[in-house]
Amino acid sequence: MKTLLLTLVVVTIVCLDLGYTRRCFNQQSSEPQTNKSCPPGENSCYNKQWRDHRGTITERGCGCPQVKSGIKLTCCQSDDCNN
C-alpha cells in the first residue's frame, strides 16, 4: 500500500507543472519569430529597439534589462507580449 501511495505521489509531481514559467519572443530583427520559456522567477519580457548603420534593430527576450539612453525599451508581464 505504501509503495502504491508513493508511486502516485511521484507520478503526480512529474505530471503536474508545479511552477509556471513566462514565455517570451526571443528573436532579433531579421530572424524568424521564435519564443522560449524564461528561467524560473523571470516574469517579464522585453522589446528593445535602437538605430545604427543597419537601420532599426529590434531585440526581444526575457527580463527587463537596464539600457543606455537612446535605446527604446518596453517591458511587459504576459506570455509573448513583446512582439
UniProtKB/Swiss-Prot annotation:
Places the protein is found: Secreted
Pfam families in alphabetical order: Toxin_cobra-type
Superkingdom of source: Eukaryota
Keywords, ordered alphabetically: Acetylcholine receptor inhibiting toxin, Disulfide bond, Ion channel impairing toxin, Neurotoxin, Postsynaptic neurotoxin, Secreted, Signal, Toxin
Plastid keyword on record: no
Keyword match RNA-binding: no
Disulphide bonds in the chain: 24-45, 38-62, 64-75, 76-81
Major site of localization recorded for this protein: secreted
GO cellular component: extracellular region
GO molecular function: acetylcholine receptor inhibitor activity; ion channel regulator activity; toxin activity
Signal sequence extent: 1-21
Expressed in which tissues: Expressed by the venom gland.
Job description of the protein: Binds to muscle nicotinic acetylcholine receptor (nAChR) and inhibit acetylcholine from binding to the receptor, thereby impairing neuromuscular transmission.
Family statement drawn from the similarity comment of this UniProt entry: Belongs to the three-finger toxin family. Short-chain subfamily. Type I alpha-neurotoxin sub-subfamily.
Name under which the protein is recorded: Short neurotoxin VAN-10
Organism: Laticauda laticaudata (Blue-ringed sea krait)
